[in-house]
Design a protein with these regions (language model features):
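Stable alpha-helical structural segments in soluble proteins, enriched in small hydrophobic residues
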Residues: 23-27, 62, 80, 165-176
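Phosphate-handling active-site elements
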Residues: 27-32, 61-70
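DPxDG-like acidic metal-binding loop motif
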Residues: 38-67
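Acyltransferase
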Residues: 156-208
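Phosphate/pyrophosphate-binding loops at sites that engage ATP/ADP/AMP, CoA/4′-phosphopantetheine
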Residues: 20-35, 123-134
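Surface "functional belts" at beta-alpha junctions
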Residues: 66-162, 191, 196
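Short, small-residue-biased leader/transition segments that mark boundaries at the very start
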Residues: 1-8
Length: 208
C-alpha cells in the first residue's frame, strides 16, 4: 500500500497526479507494477471526494487496471480489524450531525446497518440500544468522545481514528478477490446528503 501524508497545496486537482508520481518513485515502484487502484468513495468532504475519485478513475482508465471503490466508513472499520466487537464509524457531517453506520468485526467484517447522516444524539441512542460490545472510530468519535462514553460506547485510540490508505486497500482487496470491480465510468461519489451549497441554492431560488 502506498500513501502520501504530506499536506498538499490548495490546488489539489493540479498537484495530486505529480504527488502520485513522486510517491511511486520514492517507493521504488514502477507504474507498470500497479495491478489495481482503490479509492474511498464517501461519505466525506464533497470537494475532496470529487477530486480524489476523479483522479483514481482517470488513473485506472489510463493505466488499464481495475478500480475498486470503498465506502469511507467501511475503511475506518478496517482500522480495527479483528477487534471482535461491533464497530461504529463516525465522520463529522457538521452542525451536530455525523455520517454513521454499524459493522461487525469478528471473524470477518460485515455491515449491520446502512450508512446515514443523522444527529449525533440519534446515532448514540440507536447504538446504545444495539447490544454487544461497541467501539466507535473516526473523527466523529473523537469529537463526541464524552457523549459516547456516557452511553457505554467505547472509543478507539486517537491513532486508530484517522483515515488510512492501507485500510482502504484492505477493504478493496477483499472486494477484488470476489470480483467486485467498479466501472470507472460509472463509479460515483457517495455523498449521502446534499452539500450546503445545493441546499442554499434551493432556498435562494424558492425550491423545496
Amino acid at each position: 500500500t502506498l500513501s502520501l501524508h504530506d499536506a498538499l497545496p490548495i490546488s489539489h486537482s493540479e498537484q495530486l497526479i505529480p504527488h502520485m508520481d513522486e510517491i511511486l518513485k520514492d517507493a521504488g515502484v514502477d507504474q507498470k507494477e500497479i495491478t489495481a487502484i482503490a479509492a474511498a468513495k464517501g461519505p466525506g468532504s464533497f470537494t475532496g471526494l470529487r477530486i480524489g475519485l476523479a483522479t483514481a478513475k482517470t488513473a485506472a482508465y489510463i493505466w488499464k487496471v481495475p478500480l475498486i471503490g470503498v465506502d469511507t466508513l467501511e475503511a475506518l472499520v478496517w482500522n480495527l480489524v479483528g477487534a471482535r466487537a461491533f464497530i461504529l464509524p463516525l465522520l463529522d457531517a457538521q452542525r451536530g450531525n455525523v455520517y454513521a453506520a454499524m459493522y461487525g468485526s469478528f471473524d470477518e467484517i460485515w455491515q449491520e446497518a446502512p450508512a446515514e447522516a443523522a444527529s449525533i444524539d440519534e446515532v448514540v441512542k440507536a447504538a446504545a440500544s444495539h447490544g454487544g460490545p461497541i467501539l466507535a472510530v473516526g473523527e466523529g468519535a473523537e469529537m463526541y468522545r464524552e457523549k459516547l462514553l456516557a452511553e457505554g460506547i467505547q472509543v478507539a485510540p486517537p491513532h486508530n481514528c484517522c483515515a488510512r490508505a492501507s485500510s482502504v486497500a484492505m477493504a478493496a482487496f477483499v472486494r477484488w478477490e470476489k470480483g467486485q470491480i467498479d466501472d470507472p465510468l460509472q463509479l460515483m461519489p457517495n455523498y449521502i446528503r446534499r452539500s450546503e451549497a445545493e441546499v442554499l441554492w434551493e432556498k435562494l431560488h424558492g425550491m423545496n
